[in-house]
């Protein structure tokens, strides 16, 4: 199989979230050949401008506050190289390889639109690095999301020209060594090419896309753990009736309620308390699941739409208008749409965890759990059961609540006030990874607690889909009897939630991918 055969062939302007999810899973990308003529036409316009007397930002001028400084033609290559190494100012831990690879793929898509003015060789260098698994070492911190993700993209570009550092087979090597080992030669940047590579939102967008995909997955998993909690608490399914959802009309709410109903259909536990149950209404954490989970699903779908647009966008500056031959300065590098999207995803992640934590608290409380023992241990007192697991869920929710504060409103001026309003998209998107980790752990705890509650409801059993979920859990974690070391149980349950390892019996009734595609 050739590199071309293994790669996703991308057509900028029509790339889907499915395509990008495959990149996160490890597939490389190559540009559809039909886009090369436009790429080459834009590069020719830039080459002509580099030899002219008229100042054009970033081609024959300095950058940022130094835009008034003219650069002679014989120094344009040096200008681009110096731009890259001077902007390699990232700090902090290395960005995970899947995010770096997605960032590189997004840059290929953006450059492939033929409005950046780079030569074909630039895109081919990125394609070669992806195909041969040359992963630039990109520190996570240092971008404010305007003028693009300068520092992270500079670290990516440094490896393209044989400088900086890369990770190959888990080892950190110089950029030059990484290219040589992959059979690639260092690239010499032409006019505007360094600027086109580091000016853009691809770092922030890569993190945000990963966040929206994980958010949708965890929102679906929360419907499974939430359904388990309904039966563990012997709660009512009447609030999930379709007539109630239709009277409000939100698509996510309707889908969430239908999913909960399907997951609980046929439950003997539910049938056992249809008569003689004196409770009138359940707590909100059980009763209002469609409203909360549905709102989260709707938010995730809306942000996905914005991120699909951004993934297909040209976000550097200046831009080449091939039809007119002009090179025009603009502001597409400003990552406000990404920052808003990331802030929105953070809200959804936080609220899914908030209501899950309340369900956990309900199930361990003998005043609320309708006849179950305190902390769901068969012998309370000498055993503490799930007492501290609930505390852990509360701690994780508190962390996510703090992280959910909007980053996009926290602008600060940079570059001698030339770049006087910034998006903070990089920070907004980066925190989603930690928030998703916390949410997976919270849902894992709910999975353990709700499964324990259902086990204690014997001889009554839950529905067939939920029996299958509990069986999958029990392959990893036995029901809790006497107290035991719990950290391993929590880790296994979180991994089950995160890995999409829930049984087909449950997955078959979950909401399907709602994400729009660009035609």
Curated annotation (Swiss-Prot):
Pfam family, one: Lyase_aromatic
Pathway: Amino-acid degradation; L-histidine degradation into L-glutamate; N-formimidoyl-L-glutamate from L-histidine: step 1/3
UniProt enzyme class: lyase
PROSITE patterns the UniProt entry points to: PAL_HISTIDASE (PS00488)
Keyword check for Lyase: yes
Domain of life according to the entry: Bacteria
Keyword Lyase assigned: yes
Primary location recorded for the protein, binned into one broad class: cytoplasm
Subcellular location field: Cytoplasm
Name of the protein in its database record: Histidine ammonia-lyase
Organism this protein belongs to: Bradyrhizobium diazoefficiens (strain JCM 10833 / BCRC 13528 / IAM 13628 / NBRC 14792 / USDA 110)
């Amino acid at each position: 199989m050739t590199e071309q055969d293994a790669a996703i062939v991308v057509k900028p302007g029509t790339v889907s979230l499915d395509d990008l999810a495959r990149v996160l899973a490890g597939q490389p990308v190559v540009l559809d050949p039909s886009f090369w003529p436009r790429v080459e036409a834009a590069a020719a316009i830039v080459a002509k401008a580099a030899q002219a007397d008229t100042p054009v930002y970033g081609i024959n001028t300095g950058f940022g506050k130094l835009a008034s400084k003219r650069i002679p033609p014989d120094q344009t290559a040096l200008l681009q190289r110096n731009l890259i190494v001077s902007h390699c100012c990232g700090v902090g831990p290395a960005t995970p390889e899947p995010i770096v690879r997605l960032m590189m793929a997004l840059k290929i898509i953006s450059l492939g639109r033929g409005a950046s003015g780079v030569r074909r060789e630039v895109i081919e260098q990125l394609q070669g690095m992806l195909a041969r698994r040359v992963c630039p070492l990109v520190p996570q911190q240092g971008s404010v999301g305007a003028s693009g993700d300068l520092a992270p993209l500079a670290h990516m570009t440094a490896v393209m020209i044989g400088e900086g550092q890369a990770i190959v087979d888990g080892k950190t090597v110089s950029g030059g060594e990484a290219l040589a080992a992959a059979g690639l030669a260092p690239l010499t940047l032409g006019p505007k090419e360094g600027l086109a590579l580091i000016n853009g939102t691809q770092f922030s967008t890569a993190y945000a896309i990963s966040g929206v995909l994980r958010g949708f997955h965890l929102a679906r998993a929360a419907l499974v753990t939430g359904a388990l909690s309904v039966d563990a608490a012997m709660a009512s399914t009447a609030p999930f009736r379709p007539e109630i959802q239709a009277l409000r009309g939100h698509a996510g709410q309707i889908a969430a309620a239908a999913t909960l109903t399907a997951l609980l259909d046929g439950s003997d536990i539910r049938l056992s308390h249809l008569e003689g149950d004196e409770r009138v209404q359940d707590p909100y954490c059980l009763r209002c699941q469609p409203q909360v989970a549905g709102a989260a699903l709707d938010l995730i779908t809306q942000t996905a739409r914005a991120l699909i647009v951004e993934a297909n966008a040209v976000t550097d500056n200046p831009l080449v208008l091939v039809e007119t031959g002009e090179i025009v300065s603009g502001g597409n590098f400003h990552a406000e749409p990404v920052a808003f999207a990331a802030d929105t995803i953070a809200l959804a992640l936080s609220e899914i965890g908030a209501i899950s934590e309340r369900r956990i608290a309900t199930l361990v409380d003998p005043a609320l759990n309708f006849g179950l023992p305190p902390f769901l241990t068969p012998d309370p007192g000498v055993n503490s059961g799930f007492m501290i697991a609930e505390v852990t869920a509360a701690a994780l929710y508190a962390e996510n609540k703090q992280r959910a504060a909007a980053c996009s409103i926290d602008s600060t001026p940079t570059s001698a006030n030339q770049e006087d309003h910034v998006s903070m998209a990089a920070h907004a998107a980066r925190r989603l990874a930690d928030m998703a980790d916390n949410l997976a752990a919270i849902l894992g705890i709910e999975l353990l607690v709700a499964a324990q509650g259902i086990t204690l409801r014997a001889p009554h059993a839950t529905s067939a889909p939920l029996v299958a979920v509990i069986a999958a859990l029990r392959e990893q974690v036995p029901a809790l009897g006497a107290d035991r070391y719990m950290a391993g149980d929590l880790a296994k349950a979180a991994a089950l939630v995160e890995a999409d390892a829930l049984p087909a019996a449950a997955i078959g009734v979950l909401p399907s991918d709602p994400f729009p595609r660009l035609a």
